[in-house]
Regions:
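Feature activates predominantly on carbohydrate-active enzymes
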Residues: 25, 29, 49-51, 63-157
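Hydrophobic beta-strand residues in large extracellular and virion-surface proteins
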Residues: 42-44, 60, 67-69
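Exposed beta-strand-loop-beta-strand "reactive/processing" segments of non-cytosolic proteins
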Residues: 54-59
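Generic structural signal for isolated residues within well-ordered alpha-helices
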Residues: 14, 29-32
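Bacterial Sec-dependent N-terminal signal peptides
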Residues: 1-23
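Auxiliary, metal-adjacent structural segments of Zn-dependent hydrolase domains
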Residues: 31-53
């Protein structure tokens, strides 16, 4: 009798967990760099390009009064977020200012913006840089650096 209850319970938990919507990593990044002001205002959608997966790309449009960023990888979505913030919203994130609150009303793109790169490897720094001050960073500082790399499309740290 107990085994039936256990199996039913495990099945129910498995079903519940599989029905939860998957949150993309870029959602957490967006919350960090916008100081918690992007939720339900900037939407992300992953749609791999079927014809040519060798080029990372993102597209920025408006959907139901919200910003929609579509890309074919997590990195493309993060780069699209940075592009939107800088060129549409006028928010420049820098190494010394890696986060900023969004304005109450987000400017929407007037049309579809599409950017792509044919470069498969996008490097950042050189191999000895990591043994300078970075060796003494804590997780909070590393998270900011990883966010910075993602926002700029770096895939080869």
């Amino acid at each position: 009798m107990n085994i039936r209850i256990l199996i039913t319970l495990l099945f129910g938990v498995t079903l519940f967990c599989s029905c939860q919507p998957k949150q993309l990593p870029v959602n957490s990044l967006a919350e960090r760099v916008t100081e918690g002001t992007s939720k339900d205002r900037i939407l992300f959608r992953m749609t791999p390009e079927k014809d040519d997966v060798s080029k990372d790309y993102f597209e920025i449009t408006a959907e139901d009064g919200k910003v929609l960023i579509v890309g074919n990888s997590d990195l493309s979505l993060a780069t699209g977020l940075n592009w939107y913030l800088k060129y549409v919203a006028g928010i420049h994130l820098s190494w010394n200012n890696p986060s900023q609150k969004l304005p109450e009303v987000l400017p929407l793109p007037t049309g579809k913006i599409r950017q792509e790169t044919a470069m498969q490897n996008r490097y950042y720094l050189n191999y000895c840089t990591y043994s300078y001050s970075m060796a003494f960073w804590d997780w909070e500082r590393w998270e900011k650096e990883i966010d910075w790399m993602a926002l700029h499309g770096i895939n080869m740290p």
